[in-house]
Amino acid sequence: VGKGLPALYSFNRGIVSKQALGRVDVEKLKLSAAEMTNWQPTILGPMSLRPGTRYIRSTYSDAEAVNIPFIRALDTTALLEFSNAILRPLISEAPITRASVSTSVTNGDFSSGTGWNVTVVGGAAGTISGGKLTMDCANLNGQVTVDRSVSVSGGDQATEHAFRIVIDRGPVTFRCGTTAGDDDIISQTTLLTGTHSLAFTPNAATVYPQFESLLSRDVIVDSITVEASGAMTLPTPYATADLPNIRWTQSADVVFIACD
């Protein structure tokens, strides 16, 4: 049986000027091209056809955007779309949306303390003033908890809701349950400074959101509201001009963002 000596070609030489095509005496130019359309050369040499693309959807407000992948596992992926001061997450190529419900949090903007129950232990202080909730545990073993009841109409009880919570100065401990102090609807979680959107399905006529702090310094909550219907977005500090300078890295289920 005769031996075959197949030729091995390297297609990663890339594109060169037409004036250089005649320089076949230069090893690197022998397999270069003046035009390379719909081909993807790789560093190690092979080249393949560029995969097809298709229109999925417009960016938020048709604005310039940068997409950052989120990959937690093979079946847990998302896309973080950054546009002008807005972050819009997408799952399975569709934005996360909030349903239309009639539920609301009375005095969720803390314009008044009516309806809010403030409990302090160990010389701590919890105040609602100037449109803010401020909690401060000045003494060791101090604790502040602030909660209220939120009514859910019968037609909305099986519909997914979301609390939109703005923290001016964190961290703040938050939970929500079917009874005061419980967390059977939203498990106890720590909210850092920023805007948060926490989804939940009430399955009850009344739910009880609660804020808590054990810290010996001021923590400040700006507001808690029920998300309006439509695509869920979050504010960011990055304007359109900042988008090319965004850098990111992911660790488990956390994406760290920076901007040069």
Region locations from a protein language model:
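N-terminal beta-propeller domains
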Residues: 1-99
